[in-house]
Each structure stands twice: as C-alpha cells, then as structure tokens.
Amino acid sequence: MQHPTLQPEVDPNPVVSSSSSSSSSNPLPAHLNPANYPQTRYFSDSNIHLELTYNPLDPTKSLAQIRSPHAGANVLFLGTTRSTFDNRPVARLTYTSYAPLALRTLEKIARGAVTKYQLCGISISHRLGEVRVAEESIAIAVAAGHRRPAWRAGEEVLEECKAAVEIWKREEFIGAGAGEGEGEWRANRDTDSQGNCRGDKVAEG
C-alpha cells in the first residue's frame, strides 16, 4: 500500500536499456540497471522532490518544483565535474548508488532542512552513471521566506548529502602518464568543501 504523501513523478524522457540480449544473459542488479531509472519521490506535505537519474539534470525543472507564493528567496546549487583533481586531468566521473537507501536518506535530509529552516520547498536531484567535465552531477534547489535561511539550507543540505547519502563515484583520469580509464572509487564524503581528500582512497587501475 502506497503512503498517501508518496507520489512517484513520471519522467518524460525515461532511460531505456539498449542491450536486452546481454542483460538477459548477465543481468545487472536492479539498483545498477539504468532501465530502472529515473527513480523519484514527491512528498506533497512538505513540497519535497527527490530524484536519482541517468539523464542530464534539468535546473529549470528543479526551480519550478519549489516555487511558492510564500517564498522570498529561491536558491539553486549545481555541482559540476571539474577538469582536475589532485592536479590530475579528469576525463569523467561515474556515479553509482543503492537507490532504496539513498532515497530514504535524501528524504531524511530534506525533511530536516524543511523543519529547521521553514522551507517552502526543496528539490534534490543526483545524476548517476557517466558525468563528463562541466556537466552537473547534483542539483539542489530550496525556497524559503527569506534569503538567509535559503542560503544556509542549500549549503547544509549539500554537505549532508555528501556525508550521508549512499552514492559513490569513480574518478577517471587522463594524461600525466596515465591512460584514460585509470581511476579511483571513493565515497562522496571522501572530499571536503574545498575538494580535498579525506581518509584513504580505493585505487583501481
């Protein structure tokens, strides 16, 4: 039985698997199969919109979701793939997630922000799969009565997403003696707000 406030949104451009023959012989786990995405959650009681998708993110949609006549400030944050990490040229990032847990964690973060900052709405979208340089991996939009709580909520939600949400990324590098495709898996929490590493890295050649 579906929770009365839990209303899945329908994406107009769903991702369709392109290799049905290979997937039938060696099926991917459900949470790693792009054909099972986007996965979205909408909680009408707090105007919360959550999304995990393999499609490019749509900042205009994120802002439209949170607009409210009671909001005096709308803040949008876009996290993009930068061209270097630790002075090494980056080819791309690849994100993976365990969606059932990740969506529950995102809901907890969003509800906490709504309560703490009296938000009129919040939208959190995270892209999965390959995200190339200058493309967006996360979009966070918040609406509040005034600019100060909107700014603070946006930053706090971002930091909590990086610290707690069950999403992992692989950084693939080029040049500097490394062939394209060399990379490292790490949790989002492994880098701080300045892009510096925290803790040990898990290397993959």
From Swiss-Prot:
Gene3D superfamilies recorded: Molybdopterin biosynthesis MoaE subunit
Alphabetical list of CDD domains matching this protein: MoaE
GO biological process per UniProt: Mo-molybdopterin cofactor biosynthetic process
Principal EC category: transferase
Region (Disordered): 1-36, 179-205
Residues reported to bind substrate: 146-147, 162, 169-171
Pathway(s) this gene product operates in, as recorded in its UniProt entry: Cofactor biosynthesis; molybdopterin biosynthesis
Basic and acidic residues composition-biased segments: 183-205
A molecular function GO annotation: molybdopterin synthase activity
Enzyme Commission number(s): 2.8.1.12
Listed name of the protein: Molybdopterin synthase catalytic subunit
Organism: Ajellomyces capsulatus (strain NAm1 / WU24) (Darling's disease fungus)
Gene: cnxH
